[in-house]
């Protein structure tokens, strides 16, 4: 298998993921092999929109049945040559990405002292509460973290850099502080084209922290991540930049006319500067904030998270969201109800520089074409949506769970695609997704 050629896999970067993947026996082994898998089928009732778990997914779940939503295989290898020194490798293949192996972890973990650990290399993403276990179906109570708020951050599956973790045990409670920094590159999919197009996404200057409090029946985590530059490059972006440069050059050439009145001269120069400012329109400097909790009381369990993403880019738009899951166990069976919503809450991109000049019909026609393109891009950049999910988890065997889930997803209107794969607007903005999964760890 292609996955085996990676030399695969290691434990997930958080303690919760380690407990799921590696067990809790605490036995030190020089070489440990383990993994996780989900065999899933999902049915989409919508002919105009596909379902995705991330914006790096190659093959959305279109109308009908598909394994592309949740089917995944993860293998991991951990080598501990010395006490306190561990090498980790983890690879994952997803059906939605043609089962091509992706390296999620390739890191050195070094214990520096009591409760203090340093990780160097590629690690699991720390952006949101469940980011580190999002692909491990068995570790999630539900079939998957709600794409309503997780589709954007699931694209950033890993971090290439370093993190420092300090754990302090206080009786039956503990505190975990984490600081991290690095970069990450991936292929971003624009499903608003038919066929879909790809862009090279590069995140540099990524840094942040998280603080977790683990009590007997409650875990609370707060995190904040800042990214200096989130750049998207593709043939389409290059074409946009080229068109803006040509129009800006034409305006500056017109401004050289000595017969123009000063007010018109200033207006043309300002308009040229405005066009140049629209280059690389998807580049942003996002800040991700998350406050999450996982609590249980007797047979009840509550999962909740508040999230915020401020891209400092009016085309992408700021978003605030939440997810809430309530479950109750009846022996091996756990029915649950989940709610999630993401809402855009920022101003629209200023495209006044694309207004007609009234001086040249050909130039004004080109400006209008770009204006229509930017208006369309703003529509597709709005990932606002809300979802209601009901499901049932059956812990059938040790380390094996079977789940069924019905998701009702809705975007604000027929011209807002949300986190869906929508090639044409307007579209049917209500999607019903039914999923059945078999999750396991080994």
Ranges and model annotations:
Residues 11-13:
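N-terminal signal peptide c-region/cleavage motif recognized by signal peptidases
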Residues 23-55, 432:
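Transmembrane beta-strand segments of Gram-negative outer membrane beta-barrel proteins
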Residues 30-44, 64-187, 212-219, 328, ...:
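Outer membrane beta-barrel
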Residues 15-25:
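Cleaved targeting-peptide boundary
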Residues 29, 67-73, 100-104, 156-160, ...:
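Residues that define the transmembrane beta-barrel architecture of outer-membrane proteins
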Residues 42-62, 142-147, 155, 184-198, ...:
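Outer-membrane pore/translocation modules
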Residues 46, 133, 236-442:
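Outer-membrane beta-barrel pore domains
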Residues 22, 60-66, 94-97, 149-155, ...:
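Outer-membrane beta-barrel domain signature
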């Amino acid at each position: 298998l292609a996955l085996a050629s990676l030399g695969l896999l290691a434990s997930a970067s958080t303690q919760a993921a380690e407990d799921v993947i590696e067990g809790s026996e605490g036995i030190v082994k020089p070489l440990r092999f383990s993994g996780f898998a989900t065999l899933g089928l999902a049915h989409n009732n919508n002919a105009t929109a596909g379902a995705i778990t991330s914006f790096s997914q190659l093959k959305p779940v279109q109308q009908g049945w598909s394994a592309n939503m949740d089917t995944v295989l993860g293998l991991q290898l951990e080598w501990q040559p010395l006490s306190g020194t561990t090498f980790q490798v983890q690879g994952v293949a997803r059906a939605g990405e043609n089962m091509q192996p992706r390296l999620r972890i390739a890191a050195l973990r070094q214990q520096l002292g009591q409760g203090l650990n340093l990780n160097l290399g590629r690690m699991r993403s720390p952006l949101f509460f469940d980011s580190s276990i999002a692909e491990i179906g068995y570790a999630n109570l539900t079939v998957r973290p709600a794409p309503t708020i997780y589709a954007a951050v699931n694209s950033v599956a890993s971090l290439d850099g370093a993190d420092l973790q300090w754990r302090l045990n206080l009786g039956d409670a503990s505190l975990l502080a984490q600081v991290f920094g690095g970069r990450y590159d991936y292929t971003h999919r624009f499903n608003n084209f038919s066929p879909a197009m790809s862009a090279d996404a590069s995140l540099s200057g990524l840094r942040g922290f998280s603080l977790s409090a683990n009590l007997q029946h409650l875990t609370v985590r707060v995190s904040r991540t800042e990214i200096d530059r989130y750049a998207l490059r593709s043939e389409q972006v290059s074409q946009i930049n080229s068109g803006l440069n040509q129009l800006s050059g034409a305006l500056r050439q017109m401004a050289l006319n000595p017969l123009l009145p000063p007010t018109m001269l200033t207006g043309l120069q300002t308009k040229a500067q405005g066009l140049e400012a629209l280059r690389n329109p998807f580049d942003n400097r996002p800040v991700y904030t998350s406050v999450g909790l996982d609590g249980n009381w007797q047979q009840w369990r509550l999962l909740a998270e508040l999230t915020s993403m401020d891209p400092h880019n009016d085309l992408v738009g700021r978003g605030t969201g939440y997810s809430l899951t309530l479950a109750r166990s009846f022996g091996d069976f756990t029915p649950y109800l989940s709610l999630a919503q993401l809402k855009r809450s920022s101003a629209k991109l200023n495209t006044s520089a694309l207004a007609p000049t009234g001086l040249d019909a050909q130039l004004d026609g080109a400006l209008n074409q770009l204006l229509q393109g930017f208006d369309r891009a703003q529509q597709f950049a709005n990932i606002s949506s809300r979802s209601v999910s009901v499901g049932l988890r059956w812990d059938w065997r040790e380390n094996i769970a079977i789940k069924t889930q019905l998701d009702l997803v809705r975007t604000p209107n027929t011209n807002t695609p949300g986190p869906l794969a929508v090639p044409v607007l307007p579209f049917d903005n209500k999607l019903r997704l039914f999923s059945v999964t078999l999750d396991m760890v080994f």
